[in-house]
Amino acid sequence: MMELNELRETIYKYALQNAVKHNGKAETGPVMSKIIAERPELRSNAREIVKIIKEIIEQVNSLTLEQQLTEIKAKYPELLEEKKHEEKRKVLPPLPNVKGQVVTRFAPNPDGPLHLGNARSAILSYEYAKMYNGKFILRFDDTDPKVKRPILDAYDWIKEDLKWLGIKWEQELYASERLELYYKYARYLIEKGYAYVDTCDSSIFRKFRDSRGKMKEPECLHRSSSPESNLELFEKMLGGKFKEGEAVVRLKTDLSDPDPSQIDWVMLRIIDTAKNPHPRVGSKYWVWPTYNFASIIDDHELGITHVLRAKEHMSNTEKQRYISEYMGWEFPEVLQFGRLRLEGFMMSKSKIRGMLEKGTNRDDPRLPTLAGLRRRGILPDTIKDVIIDVGVKVTDATISFENIAAINRKKLDPVAKRIMFVKDAEEFSVELPESLNAKIPLIPSKQEMNRTIIVNPGDKILIESNDAEDNSILRLMELCNVKVDKHNRKLIFHSKTLDEAKKVNAKIVQWVKSNEKVPVMVEKAERDEIKMINGYAEKIAADLEIDEIVQFYRFGFVRVDRKDENMLRVVFSHD
């Protein structure tokens, strides 16, 4: 248990915070929740901790509210820095079997960009390491230069995406640079009789496997051969004496296992790297470890305590457990979660890779890649909230883009600038009795951030074609009410106030002064298509920064993608 004085200090802090929130009276339950969320390992001492909490709450509640506030300001000023518009993120449940430092890892295959599905493991692994003040490791699982061939750029894509999510790693390594280590462990397992070299045709091994050991062992299998004989064959593999497909190293497992994939699974195989060079190490190696062999070796070497992975890896967990038992290692605690499906997007890594190979960029807003979501204006905190909210559940989860947009909108609403934008624009001259000023809030929650647009009699303005119905009365946002004379291309002054607009049920529309217009091209993802929308924004749009996310009135949120000489290019986020 943490030092008693430190524990009492932490309880006192949260008791003060809870008291101030509830008119000077703290309660045991919320304070206890804070303590357990911060230090999950204390759950086993809950009974003793509750006694201390009650004692300290009695002390805190004896203070006046003013005294409580004074105490917080003096000792814990950070508690008063409330994030007004940030919703409280759901707390992950405690990890099982925490004994010392928690060490987690994310082990992506760099054969494509990260998407929402495979980023789940990264976010959960990092958040748990952070929760326990542990260690988070980034390990590139790049040991298949043929079937799941790494893409050289993908290493940087993944690191860029993780940094965008706010994920920091203490160690970075590449499985493709650790082959000598895997060879060392392979030799040991062969020496101990736990592994052997199979030189049979794969069809022969399948017959042997399917017989569950009843079939006489083929001579080419070498399962019963001496360790010395198998070591000699292994050295021949390393020496290039066998071609691809002529020899593999297998782990001895239970021949009666009902799952055929578990029976004597392949630890290492030969890949012709002259034909399929690895993007990092070229053709230096031709004997490559399989995913399961390399993973369990590195999990042990790196001291991984908890592995968070999709339940589709359940079979892999059992395969890796064999090696752990042969080596006498403690097996990491494995937490498995269901698939995460995003409605309206393709989640298949192979399909995404196919699009990339045909020239589609990884940040295409149609894709569920992190780069695509980022370019679309989805905030990293939104992604993290979605993943943490789903949590570690074995059941599959489905998230629609509408869910993501709703969370993103809540985060953007209080801080995003509002800009007037007109698509399908029609130009009209405005007939006014005098010059008028439109004072429009840049951010509604910050009324002091107004901008003033002066409109003089006869000025030309743009409104949307759909709004320009002949003889209709419109309210030009924050300016005045006008009647549409479509034939003469005029907007004729009707009245000034919003109340008068309400009396005639006038539609409130956005508008742009013609002589101040900023040409805008909107890139909008619609299922499998990209739609380009032309329009004009008000003058202030020219001052927007790249990556800034703003709301176009009556259109939606957009992210500034590029600023060309005569065009502002934005990507549509959501309504």
From Swiss-Prot:
* EC class: ligase
Main function: Catalyzes the attachment of glutamate to tRNA(Glu) in a two-step reaction: glutamate is first activated by ATP to form Glu-AMP and then transferred to the acceptor end of tRNA(Glu).
The highest taxon in the source lineage is Archaea
**Pfam families, A to Z:** tRNA-synt_1c, tRNA-synt_1c_C, tRNA-synt_1c_C2
Q: In the UniProt record, does the keyword Cytoplasm occur? A: yes
Gene designation: gltX
| Keywords for the protein's UniProt record, in alphabetical order | Aminoacyl-tRNA synthetase, ATP-binding, Cytoplasm, Ligase, Nucleotide-binding, Protein biosynthesis
Q: EC?
A: 6.1.1.17
Short sequence motif named 'HIGH' region, residue ranges: 108-118
| Name of this protein | Glutamate--tRNA ligase
Single GO molecular-function term? glutamate-tRNA ligase activity
Compartments it resides in:
Cytoplasm
**Which protein family is named in the record?**
Belongs to the class-I aminoacyl-tRNA synthetase family. Glutamate--tRNA ligase type 2 subfamily.
Reaction equations catalysed: tRNA(Glu) + L-glutamate + ATP = L-glutamyl-tRNA(Glu) + AMP + diphosphate
InterPro entries attached to this UniProt entry? Gln/Glu-tRNA_Ligase, Glu-tRNA-synth_arc/euk, Glu/Gln-tRNA-synth, Glu/Gln-tRNA-synth_Ib_cat-dom, Glu/Gln-tRNA-synth_Ib_codon-bd, Rbsml_bL25/Gln-tRNA_synth_N, Ribosomal_bL25/Gln-tRNA_synth, Rossmann-like_a/b/a_fold
Which classification does the entry list for the species? Answer: Archaea, Thermoproteota, Thermoprotei, Sulfolobales, Sulfolobaceae
- Please tell me the species this chain comes from: Saccharolobus solfataricus (strain ATCC 35092 / DSM 1617 / JCM 11322 / P2) (Sulfolobus solfataricus)
Q: Which CDD domains match?
A: GluRS_non_core
SUPFAM superfamilies, from UniProt?
A: Nucleotidylyl transferase, Ribosomal protein L25-like
The keyword Iron belongs to this UniProt entry's keyword annotation:
no
Name a GO CC annotation attached to this entry. cytosol
Q: Name one GO biological process term.
A: glutamyl-tRNA aminoacylation
